Amino acid sequence: MAMKVLVVDDDFINRKLIQTLLKKNPKVTEIEEAENGSDALDKMKKDPSINLILLDIMMPVVDGIEFLKIFRSDMSNAHIPVIVLSTDDTRKTEVFDNGANDFLRKPVMQNDLYEKIDQWTS
């Protein structure tokens, strides 16, 4: 199955690190990126073929929590898994309450990321 992943993080280096891990995964065929939740919402409207979102919480403009609220308010997005990647474990409950499917602590390990991708896209 071809898979398109959207990486949402305001930190350029974090986006590139995640992309490097994703490029090594044979399931991932395309990678899109967004600097904040607003950019991510725009990309999702323009490209409904995205299969998975990897989302940071702390971002300018529209943060990860606000993105989740807006994104999940549209029921047509219910089938798209969102995995939150964050250094802040204290916000786990908040991200799940707002529609995240899963949570990975940064720095993300390749095996953990691949496990979650398999879990949510199989």
Segments predicted by a language model, with ranges:
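Active-site residues of response regulator receiver
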Residues: 56
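C-terminal output helix
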Residues: 108-119
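Short amphipathic alpha-helix used as the core "switch/output" element in two-component signaling
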Residues: 42, 65-78
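Receiver (REC) domain active-site loop signature in two-component systems and cognate sites
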Residues: 59
